Amino acid sequence: MNEDRPSFFLLSLSGGGLLSQPQQAEQILSCNAQTAAYGLSLTPAQALALAKAREETLVKTGRVELDGGILSSLIRAFCDSPYLTQDNYADTLEELVTLFYAFKNETEDRLGDAALIADMKEAFDGPCGGSLELLAGRGLETLQARLGPSGLGWDWEEARTDD
């Protein structure tokens, strides 16, 4: 290796992830086995549309993911919601993806994916009564309150000095 030249490598990501849209769609469709118990399923066209919407949301929010993303986790978490029907399922999932990434940005990634999804689900099924509009407003307020007065997380240094 020539030490006079800088060494680096460039990873080019197409659409925000390493999986192609068809691969993402297959990953999404694999959730149908679980969601069928709740009368919910996605068609290949809907799964592909969700993969595309996810990529567009990643670009809009300036985020990058190196795997299939959060869609499968959202699907598994929300499939038992009493507010999801076959008629609103795909559209609701698309909006949940948008809200998920917006919440991640607003909370500066201080809440892990699983915890954020659990909070979103609790708010969606609880006080929001299945309303995505309320989730967009109240959900963020609830998350910010949970993360501390500034909405940016607990200040561990301050907590130590209060002893």
Task: Please tell me what each predicted stretch does.
Residues 161-163:
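Long, low-complexity, intrinsically disordered segments
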Residues 42-159:
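Acidic, low-complexity, intrinsically disordered interaction modules
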Residues 2-56:
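Short terminal alpha-helical segments
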